[in-house]
Curated annotation (Swiss-Prot):
One of the primary rRNA binding proteins, this protein initially binds near the 5'-end of the 23S rRNA. It is important during the early stages of 50S assembly. It makes multiple contacts with different domains of the 23S rRNA in the assembled 50S subunit and ribosome. This is Large ribosomal subunit protein uL4. The keyword ATP-binding does not apply. It comes from Phenylobacterium zucineum (strain HLK1). GO terms for molecular function: rRNA binding; structural constituent of ribosome. It comes from the Bacteria. Keywords: Ribonucleoprotein, Ribosomal protein, RNA-binding, rRNA-binding. The gene is rplD. GO terms for biological process: translation. The keyword RNA-binding applies. GO terms for cellular component: ribonucleoprotein complex; ribosome.
Amino acid sequence: MKLDVIKLDGGKGGSIELPDDIFGIEEIRADILQRCVTWQLAKRRAGTHKIQVRNEVSRTGKKMYKQKGTGGARHGSRRAAQFVGGAKAHGPVVRSHAFDLPKKVRALALRHALSSKAKDGSLIVLDSATLTEAKTAALRASFEKIGVTNALVIAGAQVDNNLKLAARNIPNVDVLPNAGLNVYDVLRRRTLVLTKDAVAAIQARFQPEEAA
C-alpha cells in the first residue's frame, strides 16, 4: 500500500510504499490483540501484594480452651481465619503475574495492530521527527497542522532530544524510539505516527521472521 509522507510543518514529503503483510492485513484479529495486551499488562504488574498468613500473625497459638466439656465448638489457635485479628485464608502473596506468550503470536499481534491503524486511516508517516529547539508550543502547533491530538510517535532509532523535551508536556502524546514499539501503546493512542526511519526499522524487524 502507498501512503503520503508529510513534514512536521504540514508540507508534503513525497510518498512511501508500505508492505501489505505488515500494514495491509484486512481482517484484524481482535483475539490476538487482546492476548498480547493482557500479556503486556500482566508482565508489568509489580506483584508485591502481600497479607499475613497464619504463621505471621501476631497472636497466641495457645489452644483457646480445652477440647471437651465446654459445650462450645472445638478451636485451637486464635490465628485461624474465622477469628477477628486472625490470618486471611488464601490471601495474596508476592508473585509474578507474567505468563508466556509465543514470540510468533506477539509478532502477529504487532502486525495486526499496525494494520488496524492503517485500515482506520489513523497512520501518519513523517519525513523526520527532529526539532531545532525544544519548544512545546511550537510542537503542539505542528501537531495541530497535521491533525495529531492523541498519538504515539515512533521517532527513529534515537528520539531527538528537542522532540522528547517538547513533547513531554503535551497530554495524550507518547514519543518512543523504534525499539519501544509495542502493541499496547499502539492501540491505546488514536493515531500512530511513524518516521520513514521507523518504517524501515519495522520492515527490518520482521525480516528475520520471514527468512525463518
